[in-house]
């Protein structure tokens, strides 16, 4: 029972962190829904105000029609401009899942085209056309520093309490198991498995 409680508490922490970042993404989403466009200056200023003090979010991106059109900070991430998330081989499965489901998805971590490694939180944006029908506008995307994100969830406390842990996912296209984070010596027996929700590729603790 103690192990189950520890695992469930950890899952709750991970989901709470994701919801915190999603709230920031939703601010951008609401602005697009109201105005359909946002200037580079407005985007940069809003993104700057939303930067978290721990810098877990390393970049904010807007992807109109699925293609990265605006990034913040610009200089560090300008190489990502023009990347089509709906067609990129590594990102298209998660991006299309978010688009089709209308729900956010977390994917990665990936080697980023602008350098470094990060997970991507895709938040799909829909706007009403002149007939009142919803049309896909694109994505608000948060680039998450994976190592800092894991540190924020305090997974190391599980090991300090005598538990071993491993977070892994199955890649959508290949069903291959990929380990995202683990303790120094994860156990393979007497394990408890829990799922995280709203993850584009099934992720387990």
Question: Could you tell me what each predicted segment is?
Answer:
Residues 1-38:
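Juxtamembrane extracytoplasmic/periplasmic/luminal helical "stalk" adjacent to the first N-terminal
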């Amino acid at each position: 029972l103690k192990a189950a409680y520890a695992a469930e508490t950890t899952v709750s922490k991970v989901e709470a962190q994701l919801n915190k970042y999603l709230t920031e993404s939703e601010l951008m989403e609401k602005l697009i829904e109201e105005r359909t466009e946002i200037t580079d200056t407005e985007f940069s200023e809003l993104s700057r105000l939303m930067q978290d003090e721990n810098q877990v979010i390393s970049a904010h991106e807007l992807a109109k029609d699925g293609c990265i059109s605006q990034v913040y900070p610009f200089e560090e991430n300008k190489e990502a401009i023009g990347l089509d998330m709906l067609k990129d081989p590594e990102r298209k499965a998660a991006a299309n899942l978010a688009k089709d489901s209308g729900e956010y998805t977390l994917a990665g971590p990936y080697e980023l085209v602008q350098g470094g490694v990060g997970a991507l939180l895709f938040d799909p944006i829909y706007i009403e056309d002149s007939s009142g029908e919803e049309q896909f506008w694109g994505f608000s995307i948060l680039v998450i520093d994976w190592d800092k994100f894991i540190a924020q969830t305090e997974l190391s406390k599980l090991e300090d309490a005598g538990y071993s842990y491993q977070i892994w996912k199955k890649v959508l296209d290949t069903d291959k198991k990929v380990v995202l984070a683990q303790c120094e010596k994860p156990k393979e027996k007497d394990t408890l498995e829990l799922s995280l929700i709203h993850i584009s590729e099934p992720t387990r603790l």
